[in-house]
Amino acid sequence: LLGVKLGDRFNNVLKLTKKHTKDHVLLFNDVHILMSSLGAKDHKTTDELLTTLQELAKAPCEDHELSLAPSLGLPLCQAFVEFENGNCDKAVDLLYPIRYQLIQLGGSNAQRDVFSQLLIHAALNSKSQAKQNLARCLLRERDVMRPNSPMTERLIRKAAAVHSMA
């Protein structure tokens, strides 16, 4: 998200996560496995994870975790895919409505923060003026929730610089 050069680090992570592509034990894990396959540019693993999760989401089940797949897990995963493919507007459309429900997926606040960062970056990079305005609102919200965050301050400056020239 921040443009940091990672080299082949995602390939190393994918070596560990790939074998869990079809596990679907925790949606939180699924999203992180997806991030590793997207980062490694492994389209086959990405498609396999999404396809098997979609199939499980269609089947009625009593598993609480999988019951969240249609409303939270799949839109979140798809938002990552859309962002990776340069479809920032679509990523915002998928992620913005569910942002406050993502706590149901588990993980710590810090671990879930990557989802907030994705939404902010997608909105910042959107072609839509309304979504760019949303990015600034999300950054103000983040600044209140995480005061004195250097990353938030950098993003606020970036938004001001990029969008004031548009």
What do the predicted segments below correspond to?
Residues 2-13, 38-56, 86-96, 130-135:
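Helix-turn-helix repeat elements of alpha-solenoid scaffolds
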Residues 1, 13, 17, 34-36, ...:
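Generic structural hydrophobic/aromatic packing signal, biased to beta-strands
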Residues 26, 45, 66-67, 71, ...:
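Residues that mark the junctions of alpha-helical repeat units in TPR/alpha-solenoid scaffolds
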Residues 1-9, 22-32, 47-77, 81:
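Amphipathic helix-loop-helix modules that constitute alpha-helical solenoid scaffolds
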Residues 14-26, 51-68, 96-109, 137-148:
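Solenoid-like repeat scaffolds
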Residues 135-166:
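Eukaryotic acidic, Ser/Thr-rich intrinsically disordered low-complexity regions
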Residues 57-77, 81, 86-122:
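Generic long, charged, amphipathic alpha-helical segments
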Residues 31-32, 36-39, 72-84, 114-125, ...:
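"A position-specific structural signal for the A-helix of alpha-solenoid helical repeats
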